[in-house]
Amino acid sequence: RNIVEDEMQRFFDFINIPTNENGYVRAAIAHLWFVIIHPMDDGNGRIARALSDMMLSRAENSPIRLYSMSSAINDSKRSYYDILELTTTGTIDISAWIEWFLQTVLTAQKNAHLTIEKVVAKARFWQLHIHNDLNPRQKKVLNRLLDAGKEGFEGGMNARKYASLCDCSRVTASRDLSDLLDKGCIKSRGAGGRSTSYDVEWESTK
């Protein structure tokens, strides 16, 4: 047997033998180990990311997770390759890799939590305003604000942005916004007049 086959056998033993060691750290080690072995001509990175997700599912004792480590790594490709190069070049210390991996898991979990919060808030908002008679333009703008989340729509919504988004006149935009304000769908922010902007009435989504 060649070196790769021997290493793969050790690798499979590592990921399959039950242990009380920290599952998140084991997921980090498994990912790095597979990348270093590099058993395939192509696709080693994708397989390593899939292995990470599998190991994290085991660590959390759940077949379903609300975040994807594969996606999180794809979103941080530059730092991912930087830390891999640092860890696999002239050192046997993998502490920096484990720290990066665990921080990326934490970031993925936080982002998933924020996404869930947005989805829940959006559902609650529309449930609360289910009986409001809103035109397609108003629904489009409200969905854009809801999808952006709290403070996510820079500068808030105003008549100019509304008119541009809905391809309508400023007069129509102002009338629609005033109607949304009267119906409690949005709240005003700013000093008033031309500087007035609007955001979703987030209190109604709690």
Q: What do the predicted segments below correspond to?
A:
Residues 177-178:
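Short, hydrophobic-biased segments on the C-terminal half of alpha helices
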Residues 184:
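Glycine-centered, phosphate/nucleic-acid-interacting loop/turn motifs that mediate DNA/RNA or nucleotide
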